[in-house]
Amino acid sequence: MDRRRIRYRIEYGVFQIFLFVMRCLPVRTANQMADGVAWILFHLIPRRMTRYQVARENLQRAFGNSLNDWQIDETIHGMWRHLFRMIVEIVHLPRRLRLYNCLDILDFTGRDDCVKAMCSGRPVLFLGGHFGNWEVSVNTFGHFGFPMSVVARALDNPWLHQWFRQFRESTGNRLIDKDGASSELMRIMERGGMASLLCDQDAGRSGLFVDFFGKPASTFKSIGLLALQYNALIVVGGAWRLPDAEQAGARWNRFNLTTEDVIDPADYQGVNGLTELTQRFTTSLENLIRRAPEQYFWVHRRWKTEPNTRRKARAA
């Protein structure tokens, strides 16, 4: 057995122990543990190991002078609290979120617009980002009888990947490997199906540059092209955790499942239609993130690729 397989087995064993411990703990205690780990990571772990500078630069790029140093640090600390709470929520999700108790756990914003899109008979692309708890979103749609195909990168550890596959498909959703997803997405669109994917990943030099928080960000063209080719509606949304002040008396964490925007590609048939469509869903995601900035993954290098004009100016 090679070292990699040994490491994978150890990782999976540790993960199973973590699952057992988290399932045994009350919700409040599990949240407190998540907050404690976030405090240690933010205050005690060397910042070069936690990509602190990347998060800080991203926040400064997104919000400019509207955030002072203290507010930036509070947002980064809040981001880590959110991420560790999300891990705990994923462990609890299969037993805590059921169809009969959805209204106790979820508030809905824009629900009617989302339902109309799903019942339109047209293919639908659900777009989200590294924001809130995206697992709650797709899990909820499965419970309500609207299963969809979820595009995600395969995990390196095959045992962990299988666990997450079973978790994501437990409510009827289907997992699609990000590598080679294009052909499968086209088949889904041809059948009038629904698919969910992230739209805030850097697309490299071949991407389409549109503004994200007022700064040009390379964005995949494929989303807009799919929508335009197959007349697919685009629904931008996500599930974000409600503030602690609104959690009082709840048996589990509560979320707002928000439909931020529903976009019809028929409105973008002009010469610049692809750019305008891509800009609209990117702006919609930005508006969603502004609802709870601390629940966005700011260590994600969204602005990694610079436009050609900026690269040429730097080289001159």
Name these PLM-found stretches.
Residues 13, 51, 106, 177, ...:
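Soluble or luminal CAZymes and related metallo-dependent hydrolases
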Residues 93, 120-179, 205-208, 212:
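Catalytic core of membrane glycerolipid acyltransferases/transacylases, capturing the structured
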Residues 100-105, 153, 170-176, 213-214, ...:
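Short, flexible loop segments at the rims of nucleotide/cofactor-binding pockets, characterized by
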Residues 48-54, 154-158, 217-220:
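Active-site metal-coordination segments of metallo-dependent hydrolases
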Residues 1-128, 172:
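Membrane-anchoring hydrophobic helices of lipid-metabolizing enzymes
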Residues 17, 54, 112, 136, ...:
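Short Gly/charged-rich anion-binding patches and loops
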Residues 2-6, 28, 65-69, 77, ...:
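Non-catalytic C-terminal accessory region of glycerolipid acyltransferases
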